[in-house]
Amino acid sequence: VTTRLGEKLRDLRKQRGLTLEKLADMAGLSKSYLWELENRESQRPSAEKLTALADVLGVATPYFFEEDVRAPQERHLDDAFFRGYKNLEPDAKEQLRKILETFKKGS
């Protein structure tokens, strides 16, 4: 879990344009501790520290433990797309499937 945790922390921090120092300061942690979380496998942060980081980074604490490594906004966009897809008429769904097949062949 920690390797994924470190990756998620680093990715979110960079997406938010935060340095290690700035995020650590905002979450009430030391810069070195945050570096350890991002880079070492053996770290086991407390629930309080994870909650502080989640609050600063704008995600729910369980995000750090989810297997889906996509950023929250990417997941939100995917979810919105599929909700919209479900409401389409059958002909429109078929057109989208054909477009998708065209993209698959091109890659």
Language-model-detected regions and their locations in the chain:
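A short, Lys/Arg-rich alpha-helix, primarily the initiator
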Residues: 1-15
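Short alpha-helical DNA-recognition segment
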Residues: 17-37, 52
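DNA major-groove recognition helix of helix-turn-helix/homeodomain DNA-binding modules
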Residues: 28, 48-63
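Recognition helix of helix-turn-helix/homeodomain-like DNA-binding domains
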Residues: 28-45, 66-69
